[in-house]
Amino acid sequence: MISKTKNQYLKQLAEKIFIEDKNFAREFKVHSAAKSVHHGYIGGLLEHSLSVAKICESYASLYPQLNRDLIVMCALWHDMGKVEELSSFPENDYTDEGQLVGHIVMGAIKLDRLIREIPGFPPKLANEVKHCMLAHHGELEFGSPKKPALLEAIALSQADNLDAKMETFAEIMEKQKEDQEWSGFQRLLDTRIRKTSI
């Protein structure tokens, strides 16, 4: 995905995050995406990030008005703050900074620092990248400091939500007994759920 990126600044930023920073890259590959909600297992963060990036890649092919490089690269690093928000396994619990600041702001701070290290990084693009990070939960009540104001930020928040819900559903169904059609009430989905009949 990074190799297909045409924008030199976004490509440089992705390489700084995932290739040059070997410690971060190693942690990112084995970290969970959550404590318990979705992808809360070893490698869950990488799996979730790649899934969101693939969804965004498909959005970009369906909707040519989306900037492919911006949405796919932002999808790859949208949850990078989780590496510091959550402790490593076996604890997989919130750190003090994670509790007080949260992964969205932590990720945006790290992105800002890395962007400043890239000579000539366009200020408008820098703001668009940071906005996608800050708005990726879509709504203020879901923890986003900003509501999406760019098409790419809207699409990213939808892709993130879709992948989280699909994984949550799969994890619930995996725990169901073979002969049990319906789950109990699921607070995270605000409903009971069942598998399709075919």
Predicted regions span which residues?
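Residues that form generic nucleotide/phosphate-binding pockets
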Residues: M1-T5, K16-I17, C132, Q158, ...
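Alpha-helix initiation and N-capping motif
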Residues: L10-K11, D21, A126-N127, E152, ...
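Generic detection of intrinsically disordered/low-complexity segments and helix-coil linkers/edges
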Residues: K22, Q176-D179
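Short, mixed-charge aromatic SLiMs
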Residues: H136-G138, E178-R187
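Acidic/His-rich, divalent-metal-binding segments that scaffold phosphate/diphosphate chemistry
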Residues: M1-G98, E139
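Divalent metal-dependent catalytic cores for phosphoryl transfer on phosphate-bearing substrates
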Residues: S58-Q176
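N-terminal intrinsically disordered, cationic/polar leader segments
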Residues: S157, W182-R187, T196-I198
